[in-house]
Amino acid sequence: MAPPHRHHNFRPENVYKRAEDLIAVGQRNAALETLYELITSKRIRYLAVQDLEPIALLLIELAVDLRKGKLAKDALHQYKKNVQLSENGLESVQVIVRKFIELAEKKLEEAQAKADVKIDQGEVEDLEAAQTPESILLSAVSNADSADRTERELVNPWLRFLWEALRAVLDILRNNSKLEVTYSAIVNQAFQFCLKFNRKAEFRRLCELLRGHMQSVTTQIKPTGSMNAIDLSDSETVQRYLDQRFAQLNISVKLELWQESFRSVDDVHTLITASKKAPRPVMMANYYENLGRIFAVSGNSLYHAAAWNKFFNLYCQSPNATDDELSHYASILVLATLSVPQKSLNSNETVVDDHKAKNAKLTSLLNLNQVPTRDTLLKSIVSRSILSFVDPAVKQLFTVLEEDEFHPLTIKKKVSEVFQLIESNKDYKQYIPTLTEAILIRLYQQVSQVYETVKLDFLVSLGIIEGTEFSLSALEVENLIVNGVKDGHLSLTIDHETDVVTLKSKPFEDAFTDSLTSKLQISPSELVRSQLSKLAQTLSSSAKVIDPEYEVRIQKTRNEALKNAIADMAREQQEIADRVNVMEERKRIADKAKREQDEEAARLRQEANVAEQKAEQERILAEQERRNLEKLERERQLVKEKEKLKIAEEINAKGIIKLDLNNLDDLDTEKLRIMQIEQLNKDKKDLEERLKVLSKKNDHTERAFRRYELQYLEKDAEKQQEDDIKNYETLKELKISKAKKDHEESLALKDRLQRIVPDFEPFKKIIDEKHSSKLAELRKEAQAALEQAKRERTERVKHQRMDELMERREYERKEAEQEEIKRKRQEEMDKFKEELRIQKEKDADSLRRRQEMANESAKPATPEPVPAPVPAAAAAAAKPSAPLTFAEKMRLKRLGKPGN
């Protein structure tokens, strides 16, 4: 513990009490400075967190009241630095930052209520921008009401303070696994702040801030002993970051910040790609829906339609999807697909596309394997029978444009009729301009196949679709034609002097473009390209007529080539399979070696980490024990000194004995306590005597007061009784008069209404007959709705019970598998115990034989007569027939003798 301060003891409770005293006398700034000095001091690192938390909370309250945002931010950073190694330090940090945001929001609400003004984006464009002299002069000379300016002066500072508080808290909580939950909650609060107050500039800064936090997480090099680092391999962590990015995407779309929305989409896609767990279908559907809106704003109709296609694929699988919603989204998908224009006529696939990288990026955002096209989207709509869900007007438009014959001169009338039906729906109406552009481009492409020169008025008349809200003017149609030429959809020139349009045809350069548009007749380019193929067909037919065996030879040659190709293919397939097997085996061996190497390295690192952590823990424990002992000793001495000083001050306060506070070394606490007790006894005796005299005096005085006031109390009671009787009579008369008046008015009203009864009865009968059929129809509709609800309820309960049955069966299957695993483990354990018992018996038998052999070898040798030599065969027959044990063989081997 740190040494005592020269003015007051360095203890949290003393500082807290000092701050409360300063607040009580109105010195809030001084109290804030006192708390700030304690929180930022390094001496609090070894104090208990529960002692520091109330001080930090009081500091935050004062900082919010005084609007000291920078001081609160510095204090929170230092507080986190000092307590983060404690047991509950980070939990305390979370409590304090939540309190900080809560107080700031409360102050903003109070300022709004006091000013009674609704915050608008137009008032302050940027909360972080400083006021310029021009803005101050402009506000001073403006015609705005002074009350409005006062209201904004009350609200805007707290709005700016809350924004700074959110940024500071996010900076404190970032990149710490134990603070993830609170970090996510504060991020959501910041999003709601930007949405509620329409803060577009602040939302952009917030997104950049979060993007920087995420980048620091993904690029950080995680050291061996790093504490509380963010682990992106954890599914819950990744899901939490995904939820944040999806919320960011939704808010950016609501604020119509489309560039920020696209960046948010990129962030979401990066997290989805890095995540090992697939996100929920609801989140992905929301992702594709917002992506479609972004593409619609950017004017990219192809990827807008592709995004709606992905969205509809997910939405139609939802069990909560209704028929109306399916029809709505299917109609939007078909309209978006039909709005995609035909491919540009000058888009040659042999030439590198300038937008290849961009298209690849957009394709990856939609999780597609290849770049979408209009034809693939149309085929998808037809193959999945999406047209069965769409609105009849949209289905009619699809039939007119894709299934019926597209005639340039009659298509305008058909499309106009369908557009009039589509305009009734505000969601469908927004696709009419893009549909008009796509239809006119296709119309002019087919006109260019028939005519070489036409009048400009003729083309303009074909492009004006009348009867719709979005009908184009002549100038707009001409502008569309020029843009079509610029984008490569059309090839023509306009002579404004003669109002003649020349439709160009390049037979040697348009080989690729004819397949992109529907053909009305054979074009010159096709005639030029087909000459060689026709000549080859004619020569082949002539050769067959001249030489009849030519076809036989060709067929024979083809069969031999096919036979050789099949044989070579089988051989090559076998070689490829063998090569693949060899490569897989090498890869498996290399992977195994690498895995073993990694496991060994990981084991060594783990052992080193364990040893290092153990040594560090021992060092920390020893250091902590030493500090605790020193702390206890200092506290013991400090308590003694404080107690001695306190007793001396109390004795001096009595005024009977005067002690020198600077010279108390000769006195101990026992002597001072005895002196204090004597003084207290004396004071107690004096007080009792004074109280006795005062009590007797008060008794006599009270008795005299009561005797004197008795005569006045009787008079007052009589007067009160008379007043009550008068009030009662007055109230009674008022009630009677009011009742008579109400009765007379009721009788008069009855007489007036009695005259209209003969007219009311027939009128009531007519009304009842008029609405009887409508009432019956409403009852019928209500009954039908009830029956439909019953059927839906029955189906839902049926599905629910089926799901419960499947879950129960799955649970029983898993239980059976667990029982089987336990049984097999028990059998293996029994088998192992039996083998162990047999091995122990063998070892015991071997030990017994070894002891017997040792005993036999220790016996003294007795002299025996030399036997006569016997034949080798007889000697061999005389040997015992029992085989040697393993122990005997090993003993003979050590002695250098053969074991058999």
Curated annotation (Swiss-Prot):
It is found in: Cytoplasm. Residues 808-853 have a biased composition (Basic and acidic residues). Residues 871-883 have a biased composition (Low complexity). The keyword Cell membrane does not apply. GO terms for biological process: formation of cytoplasmic translation initiation complex; translation reinitiation. Residues 808-883 are annotated as: Disordered. GO terms for molecular function: mRNA binding; translation initiation factor activity. Residues 326-508 form the PCI domain. InterPro entries: EIF3A, eIF3a_PCI_TPR-like, PCI_dom. It holds the Pfam family eIF3a_PCI_TPR-like. It comes from the Eukaryota. Residues 96-129, 551-859 form a coiled coil. Keywords: Coiled coil, Cytoplasm, Initiation factor, Protein biosynthesis, RNA-binding. GO terms for cellular component: cytoplasmic stress granule; eukaryotic 43S preinitiation complex; eukaryotic 48S preinitiation complex; eukaryotic translation initiation factor 3 complex, eIF3e; eukaryotic translation initiation factor 3 complex, eIF3m; multi-eIF complex. Component of the eukaryotic translation initiation factor 3 (eIF-3) complex. RNA-binding component of the eukaryotic translation initiation factor 3 (eIF-3) complex, which is involved in protein synthesis of a specialized repertoire of mRNAs and, together with other initiation factors, stimulates binding of mRNA and methionyl-tRNAi to the 40S ribosome. The eIF-3 complex specifically targets and initiates translation of a subset of mRNAs involved in cell proliferation. Belongs to the eIF-3 subunit A family. This is Eukaryotic translation initiation factor 3 subunit A.
